Amino acid sequence: MLIIETLPLLRQQIRRLRMEGKRVALVPTMGNLHDGHMKLVDEAKARADVVVVSIFVNPMQFDRPEDLARYPRTLQEDCEKLNKRKVDLVFAPSVKEIYPNGTETHTYVDVPGLSTMLEGASRPGHFRGVSTIVSKLFNLVQPDIACFGEKDFQQLALIRKMVADMGFDIEIVGVPIMRAKDGLALSSRNGYLTAEQRKIAPGLYKVLSSIADKLQAGERDLDEIIAIAGQELNEKGFRSDDIQIRDADTLLEISENSKRAVILVAAWLGDARLIDNKLVELA
């Protein structure tokens, strides 16, 4: 497994792979890898000849400096996991390598609408940072496919739109959420939970599933469903942050023409902001 830290060396390897006619898959990550990331890697390996995993804690997508400062950097452990998975290439650049003149004056990519709604409304600049780094990685790696987790549902929708709008010839693969046995969606942020909070955390998925059951039973008073869910989260020990029920295909409000709904939930548990989602077919 090659570990590359600079743009010239990455370009050199990508040119070689292209000359050899290899099909390349990219898995963009911020490191602190868990089994959910490994599921992305496995999906990429099944679809391509060569798998490139990027590990970069992107300062442009953090709206709170304290979150950036405390985000776990576990490069050695991450590389050991990826080597066991037989990943071909790890791209682990420094911030200086990606943003040589800093982030303030760096050209950015913004996806109107999707960047500022829902999760974007509570995290200003976050999705602009995501679309900027992902587009830069697409230009550098030139992958045939790229794999993203469905846990970040809005992010996946944003990347699909960016790819369509910018004309990237890349297949975007959404990989289903991987959960612990108790239902908690795997996330790097779960590491912020204390042992006691970890016992409470599966309650998020239980509330999510309760909303889904109500929708499948034909309930359509969304304001009441959301209000009850927020109360249930608070009673379980969370601080409810945002609960949305949206059209899964547009992320707009549910209409009589909506065929699928996506339930998007964000809640604080101690210092960890947990997010989760669930798709529901509407009768």
Swiss-Prot record:
GO biological process, alphabetically ordered: pantothenate biosynthetic process
Keyword annotations of the record: ATP-binding, Cytoplasm, Ligase, Nucleotide-binding, Pantothenate biosynthesis
Name under which the protein is recorded: Pantothenate synthetase
Family: Belongs to the pantothenate synthetase family.
Residue positions binding ATP: 30-37, 149-152, 186-189
Enzyme class: ligase
Catalytic site positions: H37
PANTHER family in the record: CYTIDYLATE KINASE/PANTOATE-BETA-ALANINE LIGASE, PANTOATE--BETA-ALANINE LIGASE
Record organism: Escherichia coli O81 (strain ED1a)
Localization in the cell: Cytoplasm
InterPro entries: Cyt_trans-like, Pantoate_ligase, Pantoate_ligase_C, Rossmann-like_a/b/a_fold
